[in-house]
From Swiss-Prot:
Organism of origin: Natronomonas pharaonis (strain ATCC 35678 / DSM 2160 / CIP 103997 / JCM 8858 / NBRC 14720 / NCIMB 2260 / Gabara)
Compartment annotation: Cytoplasm
Name of the protein described by the UniProt record: Uridylate kinase
GO biological process: 'de novo' CTP biosynthetic process; UDP biosynthetic process
Stated regulation of activity: Inhibited by UTP.
InterPro entries documented for this protein: AceGlu_kinase-like_sf (IPR036393), Asp/Glu/Uridylate_kinase (IPR001048), Uridylate_kinase (IPR011817), Uridylate_kinase_arch/spir (IPR011818)
The organism's taxonomic lineage, starting at the top: Archaea, Methanobacteriati, Methanobacteriota, Stenosarchaea group, Halobacteria
CDD domains, per the entry: AAK_UMPK-PyrH-Pf (cd04253)
EC numbers on record: 2.7.4.22
Pfam assignment, any one: AA_kinase
Superkingdom field: Archaea
UniProt keyword terms in alphabetical order: ATP-binding, Cytoplasm, Kinase, Nucleotide-binding, Pyrimidine biosynthesis, Transferase
Residues that, per the record, bind UMP: G44, D66, T114, V115, P116, G117, H118, T119, T120
Pathway(s) this gene product operates in, as recorded in its UniProt entry: Pyrimidine metabolism; CTP biosynthesis via de novo pathway; UDP from UMP (UMPK route): step 1/1
């Protein structure tokens, strides 16, 4: 299979802990060893938010804040490249075209953000669309997609599976609720819907769940193309 794995920055390296990065690299290496084509997109996490908060206090524009966040995602991506044993791209790709070219060469493409205004959630969905991926995995800090933000609404229920149109509706509702956080952003959800991508949103704090998802084990929430 052709697989795109999106790893949240706070999941990959919450405290820049080498062991965590290595565990995620091992998960990707195992997919490659099983014959899959793999690319990884890495987020910025708490480190990016700390830089952004400081820069905002210093008067940076929203564009500059986005650019700063992208820089951090690429640093995290470079950490992952360093940990990979498989034939990873020598340095993080800075565009979808570069990542696609890397995959065509048989490399593991690794990238962070691309342009201001696009989260790494969206970057991963766009890459999956571009390379016609068989599966898009979001390794997040939550165990799937819920009917509402479970941190804000204790009655929120997790979906085992849902169609992409329902994902768009759920994410749209969560993003318009003050203080709530969605497991993937709305642009990513819309790209998933328009492309008919199959996606799985899972708790990536245990990296082995990535391989479990590829093997078809019931982990997280499966997003299916609209009927």
């Amino acid at each position: 299979m052709r697989i795109i794995v999106s790893i949240g920055g706070s999941v990959l390296a919450p405290d820049l802990e080498a062991g965590r990065v290595e565990a995620h690299a091992d998960a990707i290496d195992s997919l490659v060893a099983d014959g899959h084509e793999v690319a990884a997109v890495v987020g910025g996490g708490d480190v990016a938010r700390q830089y952004i908060d400081s820069a905002r206090d210093l008067g940076a524009t929203e564009y500059d804040l986005d650019a700063l966040g992208i820089d951090v995602t690429r640093l995290n991506a470079r950490l992952l490249v360093t940990a990979l044993n498989s034939s990873a791209i020598p340095e993080p790709a800075e565009s979808h075209e570069d990542a696609r070219a890397s995959m065509r060469r048989g490399e593991v493409a690794v990238m962070g953000g691309t342009v201001p205004g696009h989260t790494t959630d969206a970057v991963a969905a766009m890459l999956a669309e571009m390379v016609e991926a068989d599966l898009l995995i979001y390794a997040t800090s939550v165990p799937g997609v819920f009917s509402a933000d479970p941190n804000e609404d204790p009655s929120a229920e997790r979906f085992d599976r849902l169609e992409a149109s329902k994902l768009v509706d759920v994410i749209s509702s969560i993003e318009t609720t003050a203080g709530s956080n969605a497991p993937v952003d709305l642009l990513a959800a819309k790209v998933i819907e328009r492309s008919g991508l199959r996606a799985i949103v899972l708790d990536g704090t245990a990296p082995e769940r990535i391989a479990d998802a590829v093997d078809g084990d019931p982990v997280g929430t499966e997003v299916l193309p609209n009927e």
